[in-house]
Amino acid sequence: MTEKEILEKLRIAIADPKLNLDSTTENTENWDSLGQLSIITTLSRLSAGKTDLIDGVEDIKSISALIELLKVNNIIK
């Protein structure tokens, strides 16, 4: 799974075609509590549950931090 693939799926998950590496909970309208759940669920599905085991994934507040966390945990390249 690549960074680009993750971004494409997350754009669909929270219905925001402008979602990018600079997106945060503060500047992304659809990234509310339901959006957070959609992101977590999408990541779990895409990673076959591997993201469920990562501490802190549910607390992520920015796409750049999320991507970094996924890289550190060898979920994406």
Residue ranges and their predicted role:
Residues 1-77:
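Phosphopantetheine-dependent thiolation modules in NRPS/PKS and related acyl-activating systems
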